[in-house]
Amino acid sequence: MAPQAADRPAGDPPARDLSAVIELRGATASLGARPVLRGIDLTVRTGEVVALLGANGSGKSTAVRSVIGQVPLTDGELALFGTPFRRFKDWARIGYVPQRTTAAGGVPATVREVVTAGRLARTRLGLLRRADRAAVHHALELVGMADRARDSVNALSGGQHQRVLIARALAGEPDLLIMDEPMAGVDLASQEVLASALREQVARGVTVLLVLHELGPLEPLIDRAVVLRDGCVVHDGPPPEAVGQHALPGHDHVHPHADAAAEPLRTGLLS
């Protein structure tokens, strides 16, 4: 018989999941005076690819920004690689792709310079060795931007900016890759390139947490979906399947205005 919570000495916290790369427990967070996360539990284990889904304003981006420390928790616990957040220092193990931003943040830079910035945490005193340069080149190749390495990022399209941001995260050879809306506003060709790059990471055992609006070409890679609604987890399991008219090509999303008390519309992804 599995041990029950009552078997633990009174007052002892639950044991940590030793396979967890990310572990949020009872996490709450606010943006200004507005509560956004309302006591969510989220565990991402070694080697998993987890999609974080939900309507706009459900708390998806706030959740991932809490994981990397950009939004502080107001209550609850966070551990990374088994280490409580306040003691975690090994940020080189984490690659992060932010939501909807330009590759250089308005600073003049070449594609290679931006991607190289993602490698600096792995270097000594910021000096690139041969292995570092090889990692940068490999990251550029993975996203199909090696031939644009010397170009200014100001000359790139939106989809190419997104490729560069992903290459920057990959250049550090992370153990955990967190991507916030990596497919947003990206053309189909770029989506396929990014899916291919992600497949390579999954094959080498990288743990991945994705915020998505549409599964698209990433669907075969997803192990688990966690759906948020109003800052609460309402689903944690296999990705919802498309049904009815929503399964038709070109309708790979969910309308978030369904009655909250009704069975959620299940499509390619709950957005």
Give names to the regions the model predicted.
Residues E173:
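Conserved catalytic motifs of ABC-family nucleotide-binding domains
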Residues T116, R130-R148:
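Conserved ABC ATPase "signature" region
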Residues L177-E181:
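Catalytic Walker B motif of ABC-type/P-loop ATPase nucleotide-binding domains
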Residues S152-L156:
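Conserved ABC ATPase signature
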Residues L212-H213:
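H-loop/switch region of ABC-family ATPase nucleotide-binding domains
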Residues L218-P220:
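A short, surface-exposed alpha-helical micro-motif characterized by mixed small hydrophobic
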